[in-house]
């Protein structure tokens, strides 16, 4: 996002105006003007204040109303008590994170990729799924759908199903698939050369981080899943790398990432046709254990907050085995 730019978003059902001021600092405000509900994003931003396009009311980046042009001087009414909600924001590794909680001091730690401090993504792709947050998270962490959903000459085929065994350990607010050599049927990793190793981390509420190492080179993938509303989610997939030749391959990599995400999007869309009948669902051991952990993590987080106690990770070290 450029300086003096704004962007209208809906996150967690809330209309949000995200912007970057003249000094480069990000901010987030509730979008509807508290006067007559006109989206502030439809107005003008000069790098310091947002001006509503309807009556010219102005708000600073902290949400405080600074000017009401229609007010007559000397009247008792002033703009000082008028505000639109301001949300705490932080920018980490080129991503802007918005906190919706009531107490900014209780905001969780922002997820970051090791080895890319101060870096912005080399490639970013975004896609919207017509699916609820839980089904989207479970769908993207599911290890067994690859040969059926992600069939492609450059990735894998249905005939490439293999037995897999991966070690998992608990990690902050989630779990980690321990460092391992990528499966032989995952061809894209070969672009890095050498002997690549990958580690995959999931943490609440809905963030997946993959660290890939091949000799002295690193690739990092950060996937963040944001609920737009109860039935729609937005996926942001950010890729970082240190291998210089990957920059030359960026058009190919973008095509690959888009194709991969669209395949997931299509399968999510089809799943909704069955889910609208609220069928009973079955999670099996090993292949679906990560999904079980996700629901357990959510329940424990809610209980810990309600009881005012520290979060206790319910995930225990375990090796999972499946075919994919």
Model-found features: residue ranges?
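Rieske [2Fe-2S] iron-sulfur-binding domain
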Residues: 1-116, 321-324
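C-terminal catalytic domain of Rieske-type non-heme iron oxygenases
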Residues: 25, 104-324
